From Swiss-Prot:
Organism listed in the record: Methanocorpusculum labreanum (strain ATCC 43576 / DSM 4855 / Z)
Record-annotated membrane-spanning stretches: none
InterPro entries (UniProt xref): HcgF (IPR009625)
Lineage: Archaea, Methanobacteriati, Methanobacteriota, Stenosarchaea group, Methanomicrobia
Signal sequence, renumbered to the chain: none
UniProt name for this protein: UPF0254 protein Mlab_1743
Record family assignment: Belongs to the UPF0254 family.
Length: 172
């Protein structure tokens, strides 16, 4: 049974919540296209980590220098978010001993989502562009929802294909 852990920022732990609901067989917001009875997964941990201190203390790595920090929350440009999401996915997998790690982070631009296994790591960005500094709550929540959908869709494709499609960006 594959185990999964998440280190989430802009998705606020909702990816882990959705995966756990799927694993336990009760409906939630995301409608998986795969049959729950044919897939056996377990969520080891779901972490909400919006701060530099959280990255350092929970994931045990030195994060990239953010563009700025707002009330202890790290704010990156989109390219940095893609790198940080990958590093967060790898770190949460390592720290928890999970088979698969998922990382999400977003500051300025589209949100970044990464999924890592022992030998691969891939990243995608959300469809929604927002700016943590200036966007209204509605826009930020639209990006969050897009991030949860992107992460879960990427996870489904990984399970269905057994590997990542070539169309996903590789950031290592």
């Amino acid at each position: 049974m594959p185990t999964i852990s998440t280190a989430e920022c802009f998705t606020h732990g909702k990816v882990a919540n959705e995966l756990h609901a799927f694993a336990r067989g009760y409906p939630h917001e995301y409608l998986f296209s795969i049959d729950r009875k044919k897939v056996d997964i377990s969520v080891v941990a779901g972490m909400f980590i919006p701060t530099l201190t959280g990255v350092r203390t929970l994931l045990h790595f030195e994060p990239l220098e953010p563009r700025l920090v707002i009330d202890t929350v790290k704010v990156y440009e989109q390219d940095q978010d893609c790198i940080m999401a990958c590093r967060m996915a790898e770190a949460v997998m390592r720290v928890t001993g999970a088979d698969i790690g998922i990382g999400t982070t977003a500051g300025i631009g589209k949100g970044a989502v990464a999924i890592a296994s022992q030998d691969k790591i891939y990243s995608k960005v959300t469809r929604i562009d927002a700016d943590f500094r200036t966007s209204d709550a509605k826009k930020l929540m639209q990006r969050e929802k897009s991030g949860v959908f992107t992460a879960l869709r990427l996870f489904e494709e990984f399970l269905l294909e057994g590997e990542f499609p070539d169309s996903y960006n590789k950031y290592i």
